[in-house]
């Protein structure tokens, strides 16, 4: 899981 919503493209 990534920290921030902006980090995840999908």
From Swiss-Prot:
Q: Which UniProt keywords apply?
A: Disulfide bond, Hemostasis impairing toxin, Platelet aggregation activating toxin, Secreted, Toxin
Tell me where in or outside the cell this protein is found: Secreted
One GO cellular component, as annotated = extracellular region
Q: In which tissues is it expressed?
A: Expressed by the venom gland.
Q: Which GO terms describe its molecular function?
A: toxin activity
Task: Determine the domain of life of the protein's source.
Answer: Eukaryota
Q: Which residues form a coiled coil?
A: none
- Family designation: Belongs to the snaclec family.
Q: What does this protein do?
A: Potently induces platelet aggregation of washed human platelet and platelet-rich plasma in a concentration-dependent manner. It acts by binding to GPVI (GP6), leading to kinases-dependent exposure of functional alpha-IIb/beta-3 and platelet aggregation, and also induces metalloproteinase-dependent GP6 shedding from platelets.
Q: What else is known?
A: Negative results: does not bind to GPIb and alpha-2 integrin. Does not agglutinate the formalin-fixed platelets, even at high concentrations.
- What is the protein's quaternary organization? Hexamer of heterodimers of subunits alpha and beta (alphabeta)(6); disulfide-linked.
This chain's protein is named Snaclec trowaglerix subunit beta
What organism is recorded for this protein? Tropidolaemus wagleri (Wagler's pit viper)
Q: Source organism lineage?
A: Eukaryota, Metazoa, Chordata, Craniata, Vertebrata
């Amino acid at each position: 899981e990534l920290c921030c919503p902006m980090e995840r493209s999908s």
